[in-house]
Amino acid sequence: MLWPALRSVLFQLDPERVHHLAHWALHRVPLAVARARRPASIPALAVRCMGLDFDGPVGLAAGFDKGDVALPGLFGLGFSHVEIGTITPRPQPGNDRPRLFRLPEHRALLNRMGFNNEGMEACARRLAALPPAARLGPVGINVGKNKVTPNEDAAADYLACIERLHPYADYLVVNISSPNTPGLRQLQERDALDRLLRACVRHLAERAPGKPLLVKLAPDLSPEALDEAVDVAIAAGAAGIVATNTTLSRAGVERHPRAAEAGGLSGAPLERLATDVVRRCYARAAGRVPIVGVGGVMDAEGAYAKIRAGATLVQAYTGLIYGGPAFVGRVNAGLARLLERDGFSTLSDAVGADHRQGGGKAAG
């Protein structure tokens, strides 16, 4: 196993520098190599969701590719879909460095990146230049508002991103749950969320009828606020719920020297909380829209827990950082074994299984 040795070397370097090195390498993977190296798909894991076909449930969460568009390299790792972003209308540098920290004892990351990206125009140019063959699966684009945009004007930022980027996206995600943009999470409140999502859904429907628009929620909402957000999102026409973003909680890492740093926590400490949020969202949605489970997907067991809790798809980022290039292949192989163990013919049969077997009581 070469990855543990390489990881120990890379973890001696600044986390953001390693991120850029990884992106540089992935950007240079030829399409032919990506196709050849991509793990073989497993028929039982195929998913059809929101009118799109996924050759497996495991996608790359937003935050890794912020518009550099290293799609062949990322798909070559085995991801069934890649979510680019978060992208804002105008370029912005994000928060001051250092802003990304590893907590290796806990298999976690803590970040306060702040939507650093080169803006929607740069992202659109790169996606437009990409050959169609480079899309080895669905591509999502996660959009947000610029830091300097007040919340009362936030809708204009989201609409601008949808307008510019929708031709290149198989689906779009409205990100209102990052803890690293001041005031952003206030957009999850009932009236603000309703106004924003209705405007976004209408705008996209006028330009690309049938193209899915999802909303990404925080794991730190109260049970009542989460139920309300799911209801509002569905009533506004959202095609799905992405649950969840990073957490402000430090449960499980309280004694770590980095615990006092500002930012959102991801990785293994988030796994149970995020799965509980998936479970509650699934119960509240009652089959009306799919749930995409994100947060603490570090292995097949974690992915399977979210699927049984109600996630049709799952996404990972921190799991890739700790698991290395073979991460997705291991998760998919493990999922296939777990499905067989529990008597499921397909992954879709396992979605929400805990609810049907009496284990789906909503958290809270």
Swiss-Prot record:
GO biological process: 'de novo' pyrimidine nucleobase biosynthetic process; 'de novo' UMP biosynthetic process
Keyword Cell membrane among UniProt keywords: yes
Protein's name in the database: Dihydroorotate dehydrogenase (quinone)
Gene (UniProt): pyrD
Cofactor comment: Binds 1 FMN per subunit.
Domain of life the protein comes from: Bacteria
Keywords: Cell membrane, Flavoprotein, FMN, Membrane, Oxidoreductase, Pyrimidine biosynthesis
Topology class, membrane: Peripheral membrane protein
Species this protein is from: Anaeromyxobacter dehalogenans (strain 2CP-1 / ATCC BAA-258)
